């Protein structure tokens, strides 16, 4: 076994576990928004359509952010994409707790959507794919993908 193969083998398991945990947390939080739709809408007296629009905007920002964070990862390294994405996601979630109008909620969901793009499948699976050997790549990508799909 060459030195590069040994290095790849030694980092494979932590990368797979770390990437899977990022995806698990990322998409578990994202999926929980639906649980809070009715309580938040009734608490603030918003129509449910306003909260639904915020989630739709989040999905749109996630889609727009995917190629941006992919390019960021290629140019500056995946670590920076993940760090920036995690910061945006965390800041967006914290600030969303203080949103008192539908417009502020919708605006903050743009930040959350970009955060999801930076910590989502595109960036994380690229890191795991590079860390895995040719023989283990399909299994590793399957495990990580399953972690992100609740």
Give the positions of each predicted feature.
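Extracellular/periplasmic helix-loop-helix junction of adjacent transmembrane segments
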Residues: 34-64
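Conserved MFS/SLC helix-loop-helix module at the cytosolic interface between two early adjacent transmembrane helices
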Residues: 64-103
